[in-house]
Regions:
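Cytosolic ligand/metal-binding cores
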Residues: 106
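N-terminal beta1-alpha1 cap of cysteine-dependent amidohydrolase-like domains
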Residues: 1-99, 110-117, 121-123
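Conserved G/P- and acidic residue-centered "switch" motifs that form tight phosphate/ATP-binding loops
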Residues: 102
Length: 123
């Protein structure tokens, strides 16, 4: 049984909460994967990836660019989407387990061909 595990976490405003949660277990090492570091290649050294929460995904990624105006989406960071697409591509190519929380789950869904409704009450 492996005594040490390395988990990559995508960067977000609550990164330290995720880091503390994972590092509360002995033998867990966390790698911060960030568009600011452009370190998607570090995914390859990780045993698994946690895609964190945060801003809305670009609706163009799931074929609905009109949603930006239709739903008044303002918190979109295209550079984060592009970076995390690189991370998920590397993770899946390396058959690494992935976990998405909130935005992270939406990212995985869209990457695998799914779609989203940005504001369920508005539908």
């Amino acid at each position: 049984m492996k005594q040490h595990i390395k988990i990559g976490i995508t960067d977000c405003g609550k990164f330290d909460n995720y880091r503390r949660w994972l590092e509360s277990e002995p033998g867990v090492e966390v790698v911060r994967l960030s568009m600011h570091f452009q370190n998607a290649a570090d995914t390859e050294s990780c045993d698994g990836i946690l895609f964190s929460g945060g801003e809305d995904l670009q609706p163009a990624l799931y074929g609905k660019p009109e949603y930006v105006e239709e739903f008044g989406l303002q918190e979109i960071i295209p550079a984060r989407d592009e970076f995390e697409y690189q991370v998920i591509e590397k993770a899946l190519a390396g058959e690494k387990p992935v976990l998405g929380i909130c935005r992270g789950l939406q990212l995985i869904n869209v990457f695998l061909g799914g779609t989203l409704v940005p504001d369920i009450p508005a539908v």
